[in-house]
């Protein structure tokens, strides 16, 4: 017999299987001889009151042993000889797109500008040790993408974007801890994630797919309104339908799209700083205990959000027991991010603290503020004209403006400009700075002075509000480190028909394999795609070469 229980127990009970069994015996009246096994299905921490509890969903097995695996396996068949699809980018989007293509009977060919997940480590070390940023291999580019070496959190509030449990199961199938199936805020950890990513790549190759590293897409091949494939920096072309999974930092791709009349537009982003506290202080605040988290609780997390002058100010990508890392993807930039190892054992905890920014918010910035970006255009974007502040790339150029300004304030190295938290709210220069986890080092700088006022003033007001909610958070023990700009992509596709993945103007089509195959086709017994029309609208027919993209003006994935 199997029975499930919703329990609210003390941390020491949740952490010990024997004590959990004793709790079930005494509180739920179970017979000790009948309990053969227990399994925790879900786990979350309730730290709203002084006494901390752990909420558990527990399955008890009575007079029988568990038969099912802790996670569900996905079957990946061999796709050698099947029609190939080009996937540009080997980040999480590209890797999962490739795995989904295999499920659909198509052969993925991944093209990644950076290095494999192990070789990337050398280039990441160079950023801290020698202040050198390899524009093709860094925290943003390379196998695993931006998340491979920046934490590996797997938390989403969205409930409408597909089967989240399947994603977690795929991670477990490739070596992640099964704890991610249980915890309310799943976390793999920067030290564990590279092995998982490597295993995912091996699955793709073993099933007949290909992965090409240090191969950058320079242009899409378009003939007679059809995307035929891609051109790369190696001189090699790859033919087939194309999925762009290039991430939020591939600005040369955005420039190419804009220069070739792709239907994209500027979208809202969030920018701000990394805020770093001593981990013991955050534990004391969140767990309401001067002694911190004790033996049975993990490093404490926090989440803050408020409206300030009509814009959201909120914490982002909180990394308990983590490190602040240099995440620039090119020269003359400073960008910071956060990461945590799986044990979250660092002496510091950090989080992005960002302000919501909309395209209309930067209208006050004239074209003169953005002139420096001309020199930052590369390769296929060399002939791209500098956009106005209202153009489709305006938010991207604003990101570049802040990142270069931050680099200048950091003595034109990867030493990041920083300021104590209370000093920032009082508009005072910090004459010294606390110890930090940021390896390249910090330099004291008046962030309140050089950051755009519509960002700095909202951050200051937000910090004061958060300090009222959580006593002790607003302190000069905390350090603001600039700047955090890569919270999301600065462009998106323009509006399209709701019933297809087509552009409203040109019947241009983008299809990603994670979408329901029901819209575009079903897999036949021989593994081919049968194209179908949508019942709700008149969608165009596609040639076999245009499953993914078709037309000279096509929509781009954001």
Model regions and ranges:
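Residues forming the flavin
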Residues: 2-52, 58-149, 153-368, 374-382, ...
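Inter-lobe coupling/hinge segments of SF2-like helicase ATPases
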Residues: 485-558
